[in-house]
Amino acid sequence: MGNVIKSQVGAQALGKNVRVSVTKMQRIIDRIRNCSYEEALVLLEFMPYRACYPVSQLVLSAAANASNNLGLNKSDLFVSKAWVDNSKYLRRFRPRAQGRGYPIKKPTCKVTIQLSSKSIEK
């Protein structure tokens, strides 16, 4: 892999096995990326998607991590990085005729939200 030095400037929150498909979550994450903390919460509150609630909980958790662990002010925070990855599929079976069963794959995803301070970025 080489020598990769990762410097974590902000705080992050990770949501695992969120029961939403990646494409549905991606349209929400693309909307809040590079927004301020308050603006992201307002956008998530008024967007008409079911997947907004887990993302808003992650933004609140990342802000709490930033204020408690790093001592950053919540008014200076913004969403610096946000991404979605595939996770496991929940496998279920639908009963069909003559004793058969058809598999159903219910997708899940991993969501990562990273908040940074505006004063650190400048």
From Swiss-Prot:
Assembly with partners or alone: Part of the 50S ribosomal subunit.
A GO-annotated cellular component: chloroplast
Q: NCBIfam families this protein is in?
A: rplV_bact
User: What are the protein's UniProt keywords?
Assistant: Chloroplast, Plastid, Ribonucleoprotein, Ribosomal protein, RNA-binding, rRNA-binding
User: From the UniProt record, which GO molecular function terms apply?
Assistant: rRNA binding; structural constituent of ribosome
Spell out the family assignment given in the record's similarity comment: Belongs to the universal ribosomal protein uL22 family.
**Main role?**
This protein binds specifically to 23S rRNA. The globular domain of the protein is located near the polypeptide exit tunnel on the outside of the subunit, while an extended beta-hairpin is found that lines the wall of the exit tunnel in the center of the 70S ribosome.
What the entry lists under Gene3D superfamilies is as follows:
Ribosomal protein L22/L17 (3.90.470.10)
Q: Which domain of life is it from?
A: Eukaryota
Protein name per its UniProtKB record = Large ribosomal subunit protein uL22c
**Pfam families tied to this protein:** Ribosomal_L22 (PF00237)
Cellular localization per UniProt: Plastid, Chloroplast
- This protein's major location comes to plastid
In the record, biological process GO terms are: translation
